[in-house]
Amino acid sequence: MIPDCIPLAEVPHTTRLFADYLAHSAKLQAFYPALKYNQNLAAYTSSIQYQPGTRDRVATALQILNERLGASPEALANIERLRRGAYAVVSGQQVGLFGGPLLAVLKAAHAVRLARDLTAQGTDTIPVFWMASEDHDLAEVDHVFLPKNDFSLQRFTADATGTTGAPMSDLRFEPTIENLVQQTSELLGDSSLVDILRESYRPGETVAGAFGKLFARLFAKHGLVLLDPADTELHRIAAPLFRRAVAEAAEIARALVDRGKELEHAGYHEQVKVSASSVLLFGIQDGARVAIQRQNDHFSVGKEKLTQEELLARIDAEPEKFNANVLLRPVMQDTLLPTLAYIGGPAEVAYFAQGSVVYERLLGRATPILPRFSATLIEPKVEKLLEKYDLKFEDINHGADALAEKLAQKTLPPELDEQFRVALATVTQTMAQAKDALAKVDASLVEAAERATSKMRYQVGRLHRRAARAALRRTHVLSQHADLIVNALYPEKELQERTVGAAYFLAKYGLDLVDTLVDAAGTCPEHRVIRV
């Protein structure tokens, strides 16, 4: 039986940096100044400098935004708590179609759970979800994958209209979105979730706005506060940060280049390529997001050249025409919010290693970052097959063909399977005895004996696999079972949470599944298995 909590070392695609971060490796301390606070977030409150005037302005902006998204009384009450002095736990994600992959809901659930726990422990904290509405890559968010009856995935793609390269806060769904919701309902069946999709995803609604309305409903009782960084008032509050990103661009770029070298020297790599001309801002020109580069004493904004004074004046006049890149975004977040912790995935954890120099220069501190809630949901039909074949989580992560072969091995005639087991044991035992005898004759022969043992074990195992493939050819049932298990738990050779739309689970198991995920979020520090 697969355990409820799986070490991330057994989970595919875990990078060295992320594994070291989970292990609290001492060599990462220089890259994560706030790592020491991860086990005691309340102690970090003394590091947060947050002006009452900023608190009030941000709370008012969040109130207006969340009311527009249909916020619950619980969410609006949390905004008032922020106004009165509460801290924030923040997570965020791209505004994927119909809520995007499962991991977006997992992140929000983790923020809710952590804020709840911190408040219970005496540190008043609210959960905030940062919608990545300023991203401009529509191809990353215009689709969702939902499982069919055999758990193979069906892709649903939406049409959105607007300027090419425009942020998600400006792109609007075309009338075809109604047909897409109907197609989704035909696959998922009628449910409360589908009703919410119909109300949220309507012609003319922005990509970010529809996502926000959906999440406002999903997390209504939990008081999740949604933040749209494209909001004009939030840009006005962040304008001084944007000014410093320009005025100190040369020093920031130099610090980032040096940090990249330090990461490489430590055996890691930088997530974002930075050069001496890099500026951590984008500009908006003709509705599209364009990079800003520094060239000696001038700056290029797309094809336009400006002096530093001209660029700073433009930021003062129209701060909403600028937004932060991936390294400045967390600093903007923590300029706007009294952030006690950010909950991020492996890539975000890696960004923090590089971006902490930006934090320290522009904010005077670095925010603690916690690995996000990671989980695989196992449905009853799949669970029965896992139990039938006595499978482990790692058995699933090599694709359907490898799993089918594994299943065939498990279903070989018991006497044949036992003979292979005995053969391996005999080879190992016999060669161990031979190795001991050889050591007395000539110690140099021990290594040769070990190589011979390895080759013989390989050949026995190879013959075992060939026997399994022969058995597999005689039945399609094992292949079907392997396909079903892999499609459900490791689709497209990715973790389920990164691929399967949360809408599938919420439609099938009800909106109360959100409560289950919130409760589960604090129970496993690595990868959680949840049986639904």
UniProtKB/Swiss-Prot annotation:
Higher taxonomy: Bacteria, Pseudomonadati, Acidobacteriota, Terriglobia, Terriglobales
Superkingdom of the organism of origin: Bacteria
Keyword tRNA processing annotated: no
EC number(s) per entry: 6.-.-.-
Coiled coil ranges: 431-451
Keyword Magnesium: no
InterPro entries hit by this protein: Bacillithiol_biosynth_BshC (IPR011199), CC_BshC (IPR055399), Rossmann-like_BshC (IPR055398)
The protein's name in its UniProt record: Putative cysteine ligase BshC
